[in-house]
Amino acid sequence: MKTFALITGLFLFTMIAQSLDAQQSQQPPTETIKTAANPTPEQKEVIDLSNTKWDWMANKKVDSLETLFDDKSMFTHMGGTWGKTQELATIKSGGIWYKKAVVYAVEARIFGNAAILLEDIDLQAAVGGHEVTNPFMVTEVYTKENGKWKLAQLTFSHLLRAVKMDSKGN
């Protein structure tokens, strides 16, 4: 009887250990993005435009953003997805105030007349009057029309890493 209990106990222990190991190894793969040391002129143009966009958002320059955002653009936040009109209204009203974005890495990929940017950022914002700082992987999609880049999609994906920005926004 003791042998049976010991074997059963060892079997259960082994099954639990394997189950825990399988759960831990099933974490989604992650790939760290790195800023290119020598971006192409076109990549640099889109990266610079994205950096300017963060400044415009922080300073609530809705007129400049209105020109940058494509009429069919979409914005995906932690709380929902909406179009250009709602995004501009949200910025103008202060519903979301993008106070400061610290970009740690950015990768730009050009596909003909389209560009996809991935940005590893910490975003300091006021949402509904509450100060928040979150780590995000931001995906921006731009399309080139008549020689000018237009923002077509902006998506915030919350990261599991800790915020790197200090309390002073650095």
PLM features: residue spans?
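Bacterial N-terminal signal peptides
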Residues: 7-17
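Boundary at the C-terminal end of the N-terminal hydrophobic targeting segment
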Residues: 17-23
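A beta-strand edge to alpha-helix "cap/lid" segment located at domain peripheries
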Residues: 23-67, 74-170
